[in-house]
């Protein structure tokens, strides 16, 4: 007859809780959103701990809850980042303002190219050279009343159509008559060394205007440049009958010093020289270099030149604008203006004056003349002495067969020379270029956050990986609704079974459990214990009704 033992068994409360937890973990599923959030925090912590950005590892190097030290490090990192962004923004704004500065230096040469000298008599027409037809046609220009034969009105007189170019050539002051003496660097010169050029003053003359082989000087000071004695011929000046836009009240010559690549714009850029004086003009060459856009507004030499000129200059641009405006409103051009249009007749002088006045009143948008990026100009200093002296007046009177009064009223001496064989260079330079910007930002980045370009690449690489994973999750194909329903049903069944087991286990833990052990099973257990003396935990003969999947240590008493 089998012998039965009645034992009261009570499970360890901690171990049972552990077993219940293990069972629940094996069958339950974590919330997907929570899992992804934890994974993201872990990835961020891993990136922060390996990043070369100073302070990031101390602030975000762990996925645990932020502590006091981590909070302080995070605040320090944010403040440093804010200061860096402020300084970097200020540096970028300064760069976008395109600041520049001017660098001035002086250089010396063994020889310098002498500038071109253009001179004009302020009187356009010689009175003695005007014919009746000239006076008739030039009435609107000169203000002189036309001559009329006895018994005929001026409107009845028949004259050939005027040719303004021919009129300027015939009636302008001739240089061979005005030039009394000429000397350049100790060598005599004559009217043949001058070329004819037409300006608003009519027929003018340019010395050293050859672009290919300009004259050069090897010494500075008086006597080492151009020295001329001129007779302005005041007795040939037109009498003033009435004032017009072309009427002049002064006597003398107009002079402009310019480079060979620049046409004369003498009515605005020239200076006057009076008779009865010797005028000394000390020059200094200035070479200017401007910055192109966006740092400046100069015109680069690579841009197309203005039609009619070999090189671009402000004077050429203004003359081109004037010619275009006059051709647009009057269908002609003045003698000194470039172009292929017909030369305006004297009857269109009022139209020309109106067109030029409208151009002058414009704001410059209709004719923007930019400064060339490379420009040569000449600074001037003028001084004068009176001529002739009492001792030389009689000598000059005998030499030129003129009265002393005529010499005082008409003669002048012009002396143009270099002060020294040096020139000034005025160059615009970038005050803050891209190299300075990158240097400032790099220094600020290292000072405030201890980062570099490679650190930025690390952050971009991390952002790329995170974005790639997010996109993969969004593009991952979803399961069918049927599979989803089946999965939900299985999860509900598992949860129901889990709850039922937890209730039974809780009841057994509270009231204790009764187990029946047969005597034969005890003997089998003893035999097993003898066969396995080294077992750390002897095998229990009690049936395990509490956890069918894993063994549980049990304490019992019979």
UniProtKB/Swiss-Prot annotation:
PROSITE patterns: ASC. Residues 93-433 are extracellular. It is found in: Cell membrane. One of its GO terms (cellular component) is plasma membrane. The keyword Transmembrane helix applies. One of its GO terms (molecular function) is ligand-gated sodium channel activity. Disulfide bonds join 120-204, 182-189, 298-373, 317-369, 321-367, 330-351, 332-344. It catalyses: Na(+)(in) = Na(+)(out). One of its GO terms (biological process) is sodium ion transmembrane transport. Keywords: Cell membrane, Disulfide bond, Glycoprotein, Ion channel, Ion transport, Membrane, Sodium, Sodium channel, Sodium transport, Transmembrane, Transmembrane helix, Transport. A motif (GAS motif) lies at residues 450-452. The chain crosses the membrane at residues 72-92, 434-454. Glycans are attached at residues 140, 183, 188, 210, 245, 374. Expressed in central nervous system. Its main location: membrane. It is a multi-pass membrane protein. It holds the Pfam family ASC. Residues 1-71, 455-558 are cytoplasmic. Does not exhibit measurable stand-alone pH-gated sodium channel activity but may form pH-gated heterotrimeric sodium channels. Belongs to the amiloride-sensitive sodium channel (TC 1.A.6) family. ASIC4 subfamily. Homotrimer. Heterotrimer; with other ASIC proteins producing functional channels. This is Acid-sensing ion channel 4-B. It comes from Danio rerio (Zebrafish).
